């Protein structure tokens, strides 16, 4: 989930670990491309996995640990499940838990992003908010830094305090860093 959120947060217009520029490249061309670390290498690696290239071969060309390559493979395998099960609510729920965007699911299902959202809404598939453990479980900390996820338990505590909304963009934006977000709104 985190990886796909990170890809979307790059604000490059890409909503998934897919980039069309690798569609027409040969496997050999992509293997040569991934030998060097670039800002779009992850898309090239995902394309090789889609094509069934063995992860050990990808490892040999990137030296990226197999643990991480397996995580990319899990995402690619879920892409196949999504494409094969158009409109399936449980697949939608699982895809959201893996971090798939409504836009990408819509592309797989020949729907637009709004239609996927409405399907989620009709089936009560919404994000919940989890608390970030800022102390790595070393000791208890009640700092209300939250992130959204499609898991089950919501750790957000609703209060009766007055609410505000912060609008705008610039050097410090909401979502840039949790410590900045928190100081901006408290």
Protein language model annotation of sequence segments:
Residues 1-186:
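ATP-dependent carboxylate/acyl-activation modules
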């Amino acid at each position: 989930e985190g990886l796909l959120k990170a890809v979307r947060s790059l604000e490059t217009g890409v909503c998934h670990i897919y980039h069309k520029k690798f569609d027409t490249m040969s496997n050999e061309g992509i293997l040569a491309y991934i030998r060097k670390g670039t800002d779009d290498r992850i898309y090239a690696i995902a394309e090789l996995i889609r094509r069934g290239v063995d992860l050990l071969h990808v490892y040999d060309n990137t030296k990226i640990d197999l643990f991480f390559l397996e995580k990319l493979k899990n995402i690619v395998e879920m892409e196949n499940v999504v494409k094969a099960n158009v409109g399936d609510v449980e697949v939608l729920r699982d895809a959201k838990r893996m971090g798939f965007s409504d836009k990408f699911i819509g592309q797989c299902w020949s729907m637009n992003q709004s239609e996927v959202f409405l399907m989620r809404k009709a089936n009560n598939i919404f994000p919940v908010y989890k608390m970030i453990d800022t102390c790595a479980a070393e000791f208890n900390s009640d700092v209300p830094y939250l992130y959204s996820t499609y898991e089950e338990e919501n750790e957000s505590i609703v209060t009766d305090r007055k609410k505000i909304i912060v609008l705008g963009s610039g050097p410090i934006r909401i979502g840039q860093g949790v410590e900045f977000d928190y100081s901006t709104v408290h």
